[in-house]
Amino acid sequence: MMHFLSFCLSVASLVSYAGAASTFSPARPPALPLAVKSPYLSTWLSAGTDGGNGGYLAGQWPTFWFGQVTGWAGQIRVDNSTYTWMGAIPNTPTVNQTSFEYTSTSSVFTMRVGDMVEMKVKFLSPITPDDLRRQSLVFSYLDVDVESIDGKAHDIQVYADISAEWASGDRNAIAQWDYGVTDDGVAYHKVYRQTQLLFSENTEQAEWGEWYWATDDQDGLSYQSGPDVDVRGAFAKNGKLANSDDKNYRAISTNWPVFAFSRDLGSVKTSAGTLFSIGLAQDSAIQYSGKPEGTTVMPSLWKSYFSTATAALEFFHHDYAAAAALSKDLDDRISKDSIDAAGQDYLTITSLTVRQVFAAVQLTGTPEDPYIFMKEISSNGNMNTVDVIFPAHPIFLYTNPELLKLILKPIYEIQENGKYPNTYAMHDIGTHYPNATGHPKGDDEKMPLEECGNMVIMALAYAQKAKDNDYLSQHYPILNKWTTYLVEDSIYPANQISTDDFAGSLANQTNLALKGIIGIQAMAVISNTTGHPDDASNHSSIAKDYIARWQTLGVAHDANPPHTTLSYGANETHGLLYNLYADRELGLNLVPQSVYDMQNTFYPTVKEKYGVPLDTRHVYTKADWELFTAAVASESVRDMFHQALATWINETPTNRAFTDLYDTQTGNYPAGITFIARPVMGGAFALLIL
């Protein structure tokens, strides 16, 4: 399969464009989300011109977020003629895609087979923030409906397969597979790495667990596993498969084994369809060392609800109507709230981020003691990175504040159990997902002011949304310890890195200092809420003193127009003052309105085509921080940020899942830095939680 990739992409793309061009609503994203549910179930369709085909499902292989092919193919046979509707199958004409639409949870392609048949191909990755049982299932749906559009009956067969490329990032690894039918009528192919490597990755893919590709065991179903050319060719020739299972277990790249279903829909004069499910079952999900007893194997949360993987699969597949309804409820809520808050450009942004963010987390543990672990994705594989959770946290507060609590839980647990030696807040709980083995030597990436501020701010943000003051009391000692660091370092931050570590270290960072000062005032509120009035008075007094001094140290008063600086005294510099957001989020009113007004006047003077640069060191920007900045800006400046980012989504040449770091002039990746599919884009929801 892979050896045909480059040739097929170029040829098949031309075929796709041979018909009328597809429309894209509300935009044509850089990559179109297909099955996007977890760090390992994350398959996309590249669209941007730097390697994508413009967003046409037929003519290009779907890929894992990291870029390698996860073979997924679809064919349709109409009156004995075969067409490709997904993938880059050689020597097969493609359907004509007429439209694409995305919501927060689904991607829908509309296609035509000549003037005879219309197809609707829907990829649904359900998101149920209030239902952890459903959310714990690492599965996604593919729903294919066909309809005669010429008033005539047509004989139609629908085909879809996956390749063994899903089972391992090592294409030389031996794959093994099996076929079965559950007691409740779900037919499935099970595919897995023959030698399981627990808690191991290869090119970011999981090297353990079992993949399931399933459909209903109904009349007209046939199945087959075998070499890609043989199996796809059998369908094209016969309109059905051999009901045979290839037992020659082999390397993924040896004659590319695929696992296929065909459904004969018979003579279709109106409409008919078929449903597929794809997903990953891992009994053991995470290795975690935060508990007092030491390193613990954390089970996937779904294990508490289902006795076997096939039972989970069976439930998921038969749950389609309910899952689709719940997902539509979320789609509709996000749509209404986004449009009411800031219009269509804002919805274009928010709805594209949802699956991406939730696909960075894994639910583990038990219903009585659940945990959420997050993978940083692409920038590195760090786990529960505090300065990644911080920009992401608005989406969790919007969908269900308890989710943020569960993400922060292991961070507190490791430090409160004495497994981290530094007095400031840790950066992450493990160097590479899925191994949350901590940093017992304190040798994690050092961002002391950044992470202390983030943890204090998020503690109060969660408690306010969840009305959970007991949470603040529970963690008061460590929050107070972190605030001591903020008091010592915030007004004159030492030479250190902030969350924007790729930009380098710097002393006296104006925006970083602001985070620390706001963190101190947040602790004053926490102290007051938890019955520590002396601490509250002390922290508030310090924060007010610092913010008054900060307005002298960090503002270029003589500039035209005035603005905050990147670092103290560097009046020719500037940057996004995104840490201002927490003042408004927490209702602190620590920062004078004049600072907000000053920045509102300034930002339009430095806007580039696709947004406002992060700071004066580069022309690139961070989309998450633009959205934090926009959330507390005036209406006109807010809309300026949203319009630029929505335009970027539609025009960027990048061809991977929504990047948060891009060049504001070209829309491309900055030289040498490629961020992909990161959960930080949960920051798109910053406006919706104010």
From Swiss-Prot:
Residues 1-20 form the signal peptide. Belongs to the fungal glutaminase gtaA family. It is an enzyme of class 3 (hydrolase). It holds the Pfam family GtaA_6_Hairpin. Its EC number is 3.5.1.2. Keywords: Glycoprotein, Hydrolase, Secreted, Signal. Optimum pH is 9.0. In the fermentation of soy sauce, the traditional Japanese seasoning, glutaminase is one of the most important enzymes in flavor enhancement as it converts glutamine to glutamic acid. The gene is gtaA. One of its GO terms (biological process) is carbohydrate metabolic process. This is Glutaminase A. GO terms for molecular function: glutaminase activity. It is found in: Secreted. It comes from the Eukaryota. The keyword Glycosyltransferase does not apply. It catalyses: L-glutamine + H2O = L-glutamate + NH4(+). InterPro entries: 6-hairpin_glycosidase_sf, Glutaminase_GtaA, GtaA_central, GtaA_N. Its main location: secreted. GO terms for cellular component: extracellular region. Glutaminase catalyzes the hydrolysis of glutamine to glutamic acid and plays a key role in nitrogen metabolism. Catalyzes the hydrolysis not only of L-glutamine but also of D-glutamine. Optimum temperature is 37-45 degrees Celsius. Activity is inhibited by about 80% in the presence of 18% sodium chloride. Glycans are attached at N80, N96, N435, N508, N528, N538, N571.
